[in-house]
Curated annotation (Swiss-Prot):
The gene is SPACDR. Residues 172-184 have a biased composition (Basic residues). May play an important role in acrosome formation and nucleus shaping during spermiogenesis. The keyword Phosphoprotein applies. Its main location: cytoplasm. InterPro entries: SPACDR (IPR031534). GO terms for cellular component: acrosomal vesicle. This is Sperm acrosome developmental regulator.
Length: 204
């Protein structure tokens, strides 16, 4: 019974470390996003201050025509375009980092399943060997697969397998959404073979 308790403690520690790791990773992604927003705001403020200095700067020559003295006004459309482009780039980076989370989670769960199987099988085989040497009067020793620990190991493996299956479905769903989003932005591409057929049918 103590071996079973140790095994479950080990499984629980693995799962808790995995959950803590992904929580920390999500927090770091959010912190990076906020830091990039702050940097964008600082750059925009510095840009505005430099433009105001340019506007206030006096002319070098005293005798200049009125058309040369006209100050340089910042185009608001250009400024809005630059800020929108920066926000779009940052949103794309964040989306890519969030898309990688389910795939990395699938890999970590697969590694956890493999390590749980390996350690559980070693534990079951060790216990069966100990019981067979201690009980020498028995005619036939049971297989390690028929032990209670093996049944618990199978249950833990099934739970991890279900978690990995759900994570794979989430990753596939996000990949489909990303492809659909890219197709919607790019628009339908004309088929060159169809264009050649139309040219062949046309009388001109």
């Amino acid at each position: 019974m103590a071996v079973v308790i140790k095994f479950f403690r080990w499984i629980w520690q693995k799962i808790s470390r995995w959950v803590f790791f992904w929580k920390h990773k999500a927090k770091s992604v959010i912190m990076d996003h906020t830091d990039s927003k702050k940097n964008e705001l600082k750059a925009e403020k510095a840009f505005k201050v430099s433009e105001t200095f340019k506007l206030v700067e006096p002319p070098k020559e005293a005798k200049v025509s009125k058309m040369d003295v006209s100050p340089k006004v910042v185009d608001p459309c250009l400024l809005a375009k630059t800020t929108m482009d920066g926000a779009a780039v940052e949103a794309g980076r964040r989306r890519r980092s969030l898309l990688k989370l389910p795939q990395a989670a699938v890999k970590s769960v697969s590694m956890l399943m493999a390590s749980a199987l390996q350690s559980g099988w070693q534990m079951c085989s060790w216990k069966s060997s100990v019981s067979s040497t201690s009980v020498a009067s028995q005619m036939k020793t049971r297989s390690p697969l028929e032990s209670r620990e093996a049944a618990m190991l199978r249950e833990v493996y099934l739970v991890l397998w279900a978690i990995r299956k759900q994570l794979r479905q989430v990753a596939r769903r996000q990949e489909r959404r990303r492809r659909h989003h890219l197709r919607a932005h790019m628009g339908p591409q004309p088929d060159p073979a169809q264009g050649l057929k139309q040219d062949a049918r046309s009388p001109l």
